[in-house]
A protein has these predicted regions:
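Short solvent-exposed strand/turn elements
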Residues: 84-102
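Hydrophobic core residues within well-ordered beta-strands of beta-rich domains
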Residues: 13, 28, 54, 67-69, ...
């Protein structure tokens, strides 16, 4: 059986994100596929090189909470039979209050099966 290498538990969640690949100022909007304390996975129509730095904003509509963060592209892969790419990014230097929010959000999602 394959062991999961992830440090953090992911929860499936469709959240709106806006991102820009630095140093570009072109903002694109997409939806997440899942989120963890360590990062997010989302789909996009553009190739994002591995190790690229991005600036993102994530919106949690049910709680009216949002935050911006710097992230690093850890991996990217083509989605078969599609013109999309699946991207995994890691949060860089999140403030403690954002980490606390994510931990509570994920814990609530896992305990209730309900996503905020």
């Amino acid at each position: 059986m394959e062991q999961d290498r992830r440090r953090y538990t992911r929860v499936p969640e469709c959240l709106q994100i806006a991102y820009e690949i630095l140093p570009s100022e072109t903002i694109k909007e997409y939806l997440t596929k899942d989120i963890s304390q360590g990062g997010i996975r989302f789909l996009t129509h553009e190739f994002i090189p591995k190790d690229s730095s991005l600036k993102i904003r994530i919106i949690f509509p049910k709680t009216l909470f949002s935050f911006g963060a710097l992230v690093r592209c850890m991996w990217i892969k083509e989605v078969p039979y599609s013109e999309e790419f699946e991207v995994g990014v890691e949060f860089m230097d999140l403030p403690p209050e954002i980490i606390d929010y994510l931990i509570g959000y994920i814990r609530h999602s896992l305990n209730t099966g309900e996503l905020k």
